[in-house]
Amino acid sequence: PEADVVITNPTHFAVALKYEPDSGKAPVVIAKGADYLAFQIRDKAKEYNISVVENKPLARIIYHNVDIGMEIPPELYYAVAEILASVLRTNNR
């Protein structure tokens, strides 16, 4: 339940990201999974009211290239920032 958002592709991959704006660091992958594990991540996100966003290319890139506990790479900042901004706007309504 620590994630701020879960990005999916929508069924095969899911990645959970945590972002702490005051840390000065990029969002961190705190969980990721394929197939059944992806389903479990999405299910837990819904249980804890964590936003689930479908973005097939981004979910695949993060799943294949970023390990759990690692920050997202600079080339993904813009795409992830757009998703986080959208989630924050939605949650603050």
Regions found by a protein language model. Give the residues of each.
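Helical hairpin unit composed of two closely spaced alpha helices linked by a short loop
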Residues: 1-55, 59-60, 64
